Amino acid sequence: MGNLFFYYFIQKIIMRCFIVSLLLLFCIGCTSNSGALFIKKTSDHTGIGFINKLTYTEEFNPYTYRNFYNGAGVAVGDVNNDGLLDLFFTGNIVGNKLYLNQGNFKFKDITVSAGVGCEEVWSSGSTFVDLNHDGFLDLYVCKSGKPGGAHRNNELFINNGDLTFTESSKAYGLDIIGLSVQAAFFDADRDGDL
């Protein structure tokens, strides 16, 4: 009986020492400064200067448009098949922007040359998708909000493969004039098309 108590007592001491040792190792590991998990990159370094700034006016504000703060979207995809992810930002009151990834967290604004800019129409969500199955990502942009009125149709930019796009929403029957927020594409009947 005495030996059993002794082994039980020793086992508890060993277990407590083990737990305390693990906690000490954990605390020491947490205090060592082995480098930052994230490094802040400025717009001067990245080349990304997009700001979706919302400005009130007497005619257009959260009281006259209830979805004023619904936000905008970001699409991430490789538009030129170079293995680097490019960025497309939609703007509500400001214009949309397409940034080509040049590597090492440096991007180039190619909005105008690519033909995907949109001014004065409230853009919300955006989706990169290879809609015509040519191996290049196309871009679908949803429109919402008050600005633009009847001209507020969603846009489909077909990738020409040379860093330019052609707006083709009407040809594909996707020039919707609703209050679209986001679009998702999938092959519902598994026939190979979206």
Predicted regions and their residues:
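Positively charged n-region of N-terminal signal peptides that target proteins for export
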Residues: G2-N3, Q11-F18
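Acidic, glycine/proline-rich Ca2+-coordinating loop motifs
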Residues: C30-L194
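Carboxylate-rich, polar loop motifs that coordinate divalent cations or form catalytic acidic clusters
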Residues: N3-F9, A36, L98
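Low-complexity intrinsically disordered segments
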Residues: Y7-K12, L25
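Bacterial N-terminal signal peptides
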Residues: I19-I28
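Short intrinsically disordered, low-complexity coil segments enriched in acidic
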Residues: M1-F5, D191-D193
